[in-house]
Every structure is written in structure tokens, then in C-alpha cells.
Design a protein with these regions (language model features):
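Glycine-rich phosphate-binding loops of nucleotide-dependent enzymes
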Residues: 3-274, 297-298
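Long, low-complexity, intrinsically disordered segments
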Residues: 286-298
Length: 298
């Protein structure tokens, strides 16, 4: 479908939510001083679904993730978790309700062993774990890693000795072992090589096939979206500009949509700043496997 056919008015109309949504947000807005990060975000997530969130740097992706996990509070809008109104007071509150997040910094303690890292933060949720011996923690850690297919040579080594992909896998395993129903992944493939990226994509694919955990993850590479996601949403200028099952779209269409949205935003900025405004580079000349550049994320 051509970009000019896909648009209705300013933005593509996202499909309506349904009663079986595990998470639903409506009209979420967030500003930082004079900077608007999110204008009017509407999003839904079904049980077992993997949603890929795309957008330029500065489009509002990370801000949305931080609101969903309770790290930041929205200025307006509503959220529902399993059909009930939901307004997390903190990251710990969101975790206690089954929403866990893997941020880019991962929050692993380099000096601690793999198995110790797997049990970090578990004591903060509504069901704290009792005191466990190292023997029990080793056994439970190995069981958790085996269940989701993560191959770590030794769970006794400090986290500092793990590769980037292994660290990311441990962080994801920790959220799953903590009984999370919804996992938010903030750029899980950032700065990874092909082998490490494949490890994380394989892990996400296995979780997707099991269908027990719903996932929202920020991605920049369109190929990764189609390899691991059931649905893709494009956030642009603080709103969801495109939302569609990956089976019903393609890399080419997604690229065309992104370029068209970028040109619309550039044209609007030029009108707002006057005819003398300096245009930004056209993303149409870039590799379609990566999103267009932009300012730093708010």
C-alpha cells in the first residue's frame, strides 16, 4: 500500500482495542518544560503478543516505556491493566503488578555472580523471596536459564565477564523468572554484534511461541521487527502514526511510511520556522533497515 493511500488525515488510524487486551493506554501526554515528548498516544497489547515500537530518536519511545513502567508520570491520559484502571506509582509498583522493564543500562552488578544478579530486585515486589542459600540460588538460577534456553558457561562468574548479549539475556531472564506478565525492553539490541543480537532475537522468539509473556520492545532495525514481532507501531511526533500486524505489512511499506511521516514533520517545521529554515537530511537516502536520525530522546 502506498504511503498516500495508507494515511487518513494527518496520521494512520490504529486498530481499536479489544476486551482481551492485557494493557491499554489512551490519550497519554507528557511534556518536559516547553518540549512535548508525547502528545496523544493510544496503544494496546494482547496476551502473548510481541509489539515492536519504532521511531526516530526523540519521537517519544523511551518516554512512553518509562511511563508504562512507573518511572515517569504522564501529564494526561489513562491506562488499563487487564481491564482495570492502572496508574503505577513507581517502578516497584509496576513490577508488583506484573510489568517489568529491561533498560539499556541493564542494572546488572558487575562484581556479583550471574546467579546473584538473577535474584536482584526480587525482594522488592509484593511476594518477597525468603532467605536463600547460595546452593539454592545456584540451582534456581540454572533452572531459570535452562527453561528459556540461555547458555551461560558458568553461573558463578561475575557479570563483568559476560558479553553484551549474555548480559542482556540475563536481564531478560531475571524479568521472566520474576513472574512478569508484561516485559518492556528498551532497545535490547543496541550496540550488539550480529551473533549477540541473534541470541536475543532467538530468546524473544521462544517467549513469543510460548505465549505466556507480552512484550513491548524499542527497535531501530526493521528486519528485527519482522523477525521477532507480531505487530509494529511507529511513534512519530508524540503520537502513534502507524500500527499494524507485521504479517500485513512489509519493510518497503514501513520505510515508505517513515519517510512520508518525516517529510510531513519537516514541512511543518519549515512552515513554523519560516521559509529560511534549514531542512534536515532526507531519510529516504538511508538504509531502510534503520530508522531516520533525529535529536536526542526526551
Amino acid at each position: 500500500m502506498a504511503a498516500d493511500q495508507a494515511f487518513e488525515g494527518e496520521h494512520i488510524v490504529a486498530p481499536s482495542s479489544s476486551p482481551d487486551d492485557v494493557l491499554r493506554v489512551e490519550h497519554i501526554a507528557k511534556s518536559f518544560g516547553a518540549t512535548t515528548a508525547l502528545r496523544d498516544v493510544n496503544l494496546h497489547l494482547k496476551k502473548g503478543e510481541v509489539l515492536g515500537l519504532l521511531g526516530d530518536n526523540g519521537a517519544g519511545k523511551s518516554t512512553l516505556i518509562k511511563i508504562l513502567c512507573g518511572f515517569q508520570k504522564p501529564d494526561g491520559g489513562s491506562m488499563w491493566l487487564k481491564g482495570e484502571p492502572f496508574a503505577p506509582k513507581s517502578v516497584d509498583d509496576a513490577r508488583a503488578h506484573g510489568i517489568d522493564t529491561v533498560f539499556q543500562d541493564l542494572a546488572l552488578v558487575d562484581q556479583l555472580s550471574v546467579y546473584h544478579n538473577l535474584f536482584l530486585h526480587r525482594e522488592r515486589v509484593s511476594k518477597p523471596i525468603p532467605f536463600l542459600s547460595n546452593r539454592v540460588m545456584r540451582r534456581e538460577a540454572r533452572k531459570a536459564l535452562d527453561e528459556i534456553g540461555i547458555n551461560i558457561p558458568s553461573i558463578d562468574v561475575p557479570a563483568a565477564r559476560l558479553s553484551g548479549g549474555q548480559r542482556q539475556a540475563i536481564a531478560v531472564a531475571r524479568t521472566i523468572s520474576g513472574d512478569a506478565d508484561i516485559v518492556l525492553l528498551d532497545e535490547p539490541l543496541a550496540a550488539m554484534g550480529a551473533k549477540e543480537g541473534a541470541m536475543i532475537l532467538d530468546l524473544i522468539q521462544r517467549l513469543r511461541e510460548e505465549g505466556n509473556v507480552s512484550i513491548i520492545m524499542i527497535l531501530h532495525n526493521y528486519v528485527h521487527v519482522f523477525a521477532a514481532c507480531d505487530r509494529v507501531s511507529l511513534i512519530q511526533d508524540g503520537v502513534i502514526a502507524f500500527d499494524r500486524p507485521t504479517a500485513e505489512t512489509s519493510v518497503d511499506e514501513l520505510t515508505e511510511i517513515v519517510v512520508e511521516e518525516y517529510r510531513r514533520a519537516r514541512q511543518a517545521a519549515s512552515i513554523g520556522n519560516g521559509a529560511g529554515a534549514t531542512p534536515k537530511p532526507d531519510p529516504g537516502t538511508r538504509d531502510p533497515g534503520a530508522a531516520a536520525p533525529g535529536p536526542a530522546e526526551a
